[in-house]
Amino acid sequence: TSAGTVSAALGLAVPIGLAGLGGLWSERAGVVNIGLEGMMVLGTWFGAWGALQFHSPWAGVVAGAVGGALGAAIHAVATVTFGVDHIISGVAINIVGVGFTQYLSQLVFDGMPGGGTKNSPPLPKMGTVSLGFLDDPLRTVEAKHWFVLSDFAGVLRGITQGVSWFTILAILLVPLSFYVLWRTPFGLRLRACGERPVAAESLGVNVYLYKWAAVIVSGVLAGLGGAFLSLVAAGIYRDGQTGGRGYIGLAAVIFGNWRPGGLAGGAALFGYTDALQLRQGGISVHALLLVVALLLVAVAVYQLVRQRRGGAALITGVVAIAVFVVFAVTDTVPEQFTSFTPHLTTLLVLSLASQRLRMPAADGVPYRRGQAK
């Protein structure tokens, strides 16, 4: 929980969280968006292009959002207008997004000073904000290594020093999404389209319009996540920059049970595990094994006592023992496996959370106007 690790975790959680918010908007309207990864890819390229073209990182933010929206528009045409299977359309978006940005890089970045077929020139830097009056006191407390208190000081330092304005914008989008989707008539109608579209249609709701709006917003958010990677996380566009974060964002949606708060928690968890493996390698990831073992024990007890599922509890308990044995007999995790930590965490969390999930009732279900007749 050092300040550096927390700061890195925050930066790694933002693109996952933005992609997850995009998936949340789309799926709450009943459209599965597997194409988040492709929309993020478009956001990384268009974000870099916009920042270079207009010499402003904020122009890159807008361009990244537009790039993601373009990918979302294709997805909406296919799924909402023409009724194409959502999974097929999303996979196509992912494939097309990668190929299209590679072509654009050869066309635009190749030949620029510092650019090439796989990367852009360095991009204009995004501004940061710090609460300077807190830095020295928190640094002092963190250096004392007091139990809990120093860890808390490290967390506070990580989230109050050198935070980009883009990060603050991304964080604010979480409560804003909650307010729009759960506290406004627009959000109520949109969620109705994902739960009971036929009933919504019978009440005069234009289901097509709301599904289109949700998918476009989904693309905008995913594009913002991609733009964050190129503008803030790296300061440069690189081919393959997203690294599967669109898929992890979709996993964060599922982990959060299709709610913004849970989604933010999932993004923070995945970002933190990613930061551990990047900053401190196998030793820190090894320490996570004990946490995982204790978590599995708690799940086993819950399955046995509350759910009366003896077989499932036995399997979970055996896995917990196996994880603890690995922790006890080793001192570190081989470097070859540390890079897989975020993805392994994703799989583990989803397997544990799957028992309490409730997706929107009409998520992924084809809808045609007039079905109620």
Residue ranges with predicted function:
Residues 4-6, 106-109, 181, 185, ...:
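Inter-helical junctions in multi-pass inner-membrane proteins, predominant
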Residues 4-91, 252-263, 352-353, 357:
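Single transmembrane alpha-helix segments in multi-pass membrane proteins
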Residues 27-32, 71-143, 183-185, 241-244, ...:
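Short loop segments and helix-boundary regions at transmembrane helix junctions
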Residues 98-182, 237-242, 279, 283, ...:
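Transmembrane helix-bundle core of multi-pass membrane transporters
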